[in-house]
């Protein structure tokens, strides 16, 4: 059957939906850690330069390809030129891999939100709570199912009535929640057992002040590489997502303006996440409390919330609600990309492809959940870290497939632009 091509109602819907895709858990649990690790303001400056140059070029290229071809990511490159068809398959591989585990992470967030909602949240700060949760065989699957069902419902509703409609509500609320916690974190003050008092403003200075201590050419290149990897992780480029969303954009939308707004929203939330997290962790745990990824979100921050006393529960609720919104909008964009591609591949309706992608997501996500117990193993990655099944899937997609596609896109961007705007 022939499917009518959906679309956003206008520029605002596209910007909010795309910002929702870009603003994910990586902005909140990875960006602040990299800032703390890589010299604070130095990392911010390097990242900003990359976003305004490299990132803007790739984002605009992705969206322009989608709008010009009105095709999903799988077919868009081949529509421009047969020799680039292979890029469509590479970009299709990325959301296929990410969808296997993103709803699992969403389930973790839902679990912690529920804990703070129904209790004072102190149990979340206890040693071993996170490990005990993810290694259980039932609870992670239940919360993953809830998150996946909500994601599938939004995608099933379609572009304008689902993705755009919910993004219009969720993204402003997400921004307000992040701003609220960021402002609150600056008011914090704590005196530890040794009598040392640390304040939120001192934590802000730690976050913003460039630290060149021990800086060498090699360490600076590491900062650049970290900033580049965060760029890959954050803007949703080279994953087929922005090509798919670009295919829904009306021809009268100013892409340069819209893409600039997306970058401002995405980078702004990442920056505010740093203001939200780094000062509060610094106040209660010091510099040594900084951690990356799940350790920061599900271990360090609950300890910070517990140290706040009664207000910690409220902050915990607001934080995990904001993180849940960020995870939901990103997961929706990943599933939408798969559904849009499958609608073209199999010539089936959105309803049928939502069901098929939903079953795929469910089976693979359950497998990922069981990777911490029934299918448990440890594999040493090239970077030396020990990885389970989720880590392996994330490593393959974000360390290999995405950078390769992004590099090819950047190197061939001149050719793409000649084809996109030839008369």
Residue ranges and their predicted role:
Residues 55-74, 84-129, 324-343, 403-404:
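Hydrophobic transmembrane alpha-helices that form the core helical bundles
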Residues 34-38, 64, 79-80, 86-95, ...:
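Membrane-water interface regions at transmembrane-helix termini and the short interhelical loops
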Residues 10-48, 241, 257-260, 264-267:
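Transmembrane helix-boundary motif of multi-pass solute transporters/channels
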């Amino acid at each position: 059957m022939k499917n009518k091509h959906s679309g956003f109602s206008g520029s605002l819907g596209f910007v909010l939906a795309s910002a929702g895709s870009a603003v994910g858990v990586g902005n909140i649990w990875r960006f602040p850690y990299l800032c703390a690790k890589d010299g604070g303001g130095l990392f911010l400056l390097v990242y900003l330069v990359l976003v305004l140059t490299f990132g803007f070029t790739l984002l605009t290229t992705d969206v322009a390809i989608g709008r010009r071809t009105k095709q999903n990511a799988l077919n868009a490159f081949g529509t421009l030129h047969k020799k680039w068809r292979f890029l469509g398959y590479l970009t299709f591989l990325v959301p296929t891999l990410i969808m296997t585990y993103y709803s699992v992470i969403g389930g973790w967030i839902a679990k912690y939100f529920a804990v703070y909602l129904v209790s004072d949240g102190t149990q979340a700060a206890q040693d071993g709570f996170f490990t005990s949760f993810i290694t259980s065989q039932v609870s992670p699957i239940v919360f993953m199912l809830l998150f996946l069902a909500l994601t599938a419902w939004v995608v099933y509703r379609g572009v304008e009535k689902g993705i755009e409609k919910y993004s219009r509500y969720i993204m402003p609320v997400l921004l307000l929640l992040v701003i609220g916690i960021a402002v609150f974190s600056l008011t914090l003050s704590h005196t530890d057992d040794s009598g040392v008092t640390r304040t939120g403003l001192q934590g802000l200075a730690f976050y913003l002040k460039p630290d060149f201590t021990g800086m060498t050419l090699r360490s600076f290149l590491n900062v650049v590489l970290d900033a580049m990897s965060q760029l890959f992780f954050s803007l949703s480029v080279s994953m087929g997502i922005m090509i798919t969303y670009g295919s829904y954009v009306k021809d009268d939308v100013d892409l340069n303006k819209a893409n600039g707004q997306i970058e401002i929203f995405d980078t702004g939330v990442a920056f505010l996440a740093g203001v939200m997290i780094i000062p509060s962790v610094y106040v209660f745990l010091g510099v040594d409390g900084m951690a990356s990824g799940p350790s920061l979100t599900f271990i360090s921050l609950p300890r910070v919330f517990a140290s706040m006393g009664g207000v910690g529960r409220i902050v915990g609720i607001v934080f995990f609600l904001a993180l849940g919104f960020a995870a939901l909008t990103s997961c929706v964009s990943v599933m939408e990309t798969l559904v849009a591609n499958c609608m073209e591949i199999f010539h089936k309706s959105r309803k049928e492809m939502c069901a098929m992608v939903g079953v795929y997501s469910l089976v693979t996500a359950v497998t990922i959940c069981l990777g911490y117990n029934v299918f448990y193993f440890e594999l040493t990655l090239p970077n030396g870290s020990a990885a389970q099944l989720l880590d392996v899937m994330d490593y393959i997609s974000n360390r290999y497939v995405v950078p390769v596609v992004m590099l090819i896109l950047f190197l061939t961007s001149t050719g793409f632009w000649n084809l996109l705007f030839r008369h």
